[in-house]
Amino acid sequence: MRNIYYTFISLIIILCINGCSKKSTPTNIYESEEYKSLSKKDIIIGESIWATSCFRCHRYGTNGAIVSENKEYWDKAAQKGIDALFKSVWEGYKGENGVMPAKGFCNLCDENEIRKSVFYMFHLAKK
């Protein structure tokens, strides 16, 4: 009887670990509630940050940055989800084509402003 009990408990633990370890697929930015619920004010804030920081590289492809008009690239990037992209912008990273500086050189920006600037980039690409 004890063996059955321990076998049952072991099975439950294995099922729980398996169920908890599965990673969910990130939501495409364009399909996320956060993107869909952006207000006009959010877009304006994102645009102002883009115009003062992001524009420097993403308008002309400086330092290997992907230009904002490259719809194909941004559509593919949108599949990574906002959290992964936000982390890359917030912390900075070295990509295939160049380096993304932390916060995109907007050192005075807070997390909310950086997030809005990321959404604005996707807003631009979708136009």
Regions found by a protein language model. Give the residues of each.
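Post-cleavage N-terminal segment of exported redox proteins
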Residues: 2-40, 120-127
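Disulfide-bonded cysteines in secreted/extracellular proteins and peptides
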Residues: 20, 54-57, 106-109
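Electrostatic cytochrome c docking/interface patches
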Residues: 24-48, 63-73
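Gly/Gly-Pro-rich "capping" loops immediately C-terminal to redox-active cysteine motifs
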Residues: 47, 56-87
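Short sequence/structural segments immediately N-terminal
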Residues: 47-50, 127
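The canonical Cys-X-X-Cys-His
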Residues: 50-60, 89, 117, 121
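Axial heme c-ligation environment in periplasmic c-type cytochrome domains
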Residues: 88-115, 121-125
